Amino acid sequence: MAKFQAKSQNDAPDDGLKEKMIAINRVTKVVKGGRILGFAALTVVGDGDGRVGMGKGKSKEVPAAVQKAMEEARRNMTKVSLKNGTLHHNVFGHHGAANVMMAPAPKGTGIIAGGPMRAVFEVMGITDIVAKSHGSSNPYNMVRATMDALKNSTTASDIAAKRGKSVEEIFG
């Protein structure tokens, strides 16, 4: 029931961003008088054009935790350059024991990725990609590893500018 309440009470600002909830965990804090129950939420937010952010939120109630996570995700957005709905080149990322590999894919391939990575790609507007995760399947670490890999991606024009050459000289 709490998941449905989170959806109906979510007063998201109409800013055109796509939101996805990846995980909700029930957490407990043990105190002298017993246990205090709470909830932790992991969400991703994107504009469908290369901007994406992740957020975590904790609260005593599920809707409040999700709302906090969405707000944090909006504050922590990064821009990733896309090429025809996919990446420019293969990228690797890691966080903790989670390692991810992403490769660009031709048009019509779709999103071939598992779990939390798929949610990140959907909100940021990637339509064709092949991704694989190794090691930890913890959603928090997988999302952070995915974000790390996306931050490592560059364009040919970026590399050409760093080298002081033209894009044709880089490829030629």
Swiss-Prot record:
Record InterPro entries: Ribosomal_Su5_D2-typ_SF, Ribosomal_uS5, Ribosomal_uS5_bac-type, Ribosomal_uS5_C, Ribosomal_uS5_N, Ribosomal_uS5_N_CS, Ribsml_uS5_D2-typ_fold_subgr
GO cellular component: small ribosomal subunit
GO MF, one example: rRNA binding
A Pfam family assignment: Ribosomal_S5
Coiled coil ranges: none
Gene Ontology biological-process annotations: translation
Domain S5 DRBM: 17-80
Alphabetically ordered keywords of this record: Ribonucleoprotein, Ribosomal protein, RNA-binding, rRNA-binding
Claim: Glycoprotein is one of the keywords in the record: no
Domain remarks in the Swiss-Prot or TrEMBL record: The N-terminal domain interacts with the head of the 30S subunit; the C-terminal domain interacts with the body and contacts protein S4. The interaction surface between S4 and S5 is involved in control of translational fidelity.
Function as written in the Swiss-Prot or TrEMBL entry: With S4 and S12 plays an important role in translational accuracy.
NCBIfam families, sorted: rpsE_bact
Similarity annotation: Belongs to the universal ribosomal protein uS5 family.
Subunit and partners: Part of the 30S ribosomal subunit. Contacts proteins S4 and S8.
The name this protein goes by in its record: Small ribosomal subunit protein uS5
Source lineage: Bacteria, Pseudomonadati, Pseudomonadota, Betaproteobacteria, Burkholderiales
